A protein has these predicted regions:
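N-terminal glycine-rich anion-binding loops that anchor highly charged ligand groups
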Residues: 2-6, 27-52
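Generic N-terminal amphipathic, Lys/Arg-enriched alpha-helix
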Residues: 2-21
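Short hydrophobic/aromatic segments of transmembrane alpha-helices and their interfaces
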Residues: 9-10, 36, 59
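Active-site-proximal beta-alpha core segment in soluble small-molecule metabolic enzymes
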Residues: 42-131
Length: 131
């Protein structure tokens, strides 16, 4: 398995703080995930809560089917940078948050609406898919 040799990295030339990512290792992992998706028929999504390094979005979007988000800003990041499907879920959304997040979503898991009743008709995702 190939990895970048970080022993040759000149740490004095890096800004501080910064993130240093082994893009070769990320791509290798994406290739594995893509193989799993192809072999199983599953759709694999990037969990933006866990890894939302948007500069790698073009690479990630070549291998995965989309992203999953738990809030408005993650959903916007998924829609604008990652492409593909955008799935959203949270245990609770305010009515105002729902109105902003649903136009960005291809799939939304029904959740409790704070400060109001859940209106299933309010779910107007571009994919119109609900569990």
């Amino acid at each position: 398995m190939q990895f970048t040799d970080f022993g040759k990295l000149d740490l004095d030339r890096l800004p501080s703080p910064c993130f240093v990512v082994d893009e070769i290792a990320v791509q290798r992992n994406l290739e594995i995930l893509n193989h799993v998706a192809t072999a199983s028929g599953a759709r694999v999504l990037a969990a933006l809560k866990a890894f939302s390094m948007w500069r790698l979005a073009p690479l990630i979007s070549r291998y995965l089917n989309g992203s999953c988000a738990s809030g408005l800003h993650e959903a916007r990041l998924g829609r604008e940078y990652y492409g593909g499907e955008v799935h959203v879920f949270s245990a609770a959304y305010s009515q105002a948050a729902l109105e902003e997040i649903l136009p960005l979503a291809d799939h939304a898991e029904p959740a409790v609406v704070q400060d109001g009743d859940l209106d299933r008709d309010a779910f107007n995702c571009s994919g119109d898919q609900f569990l």
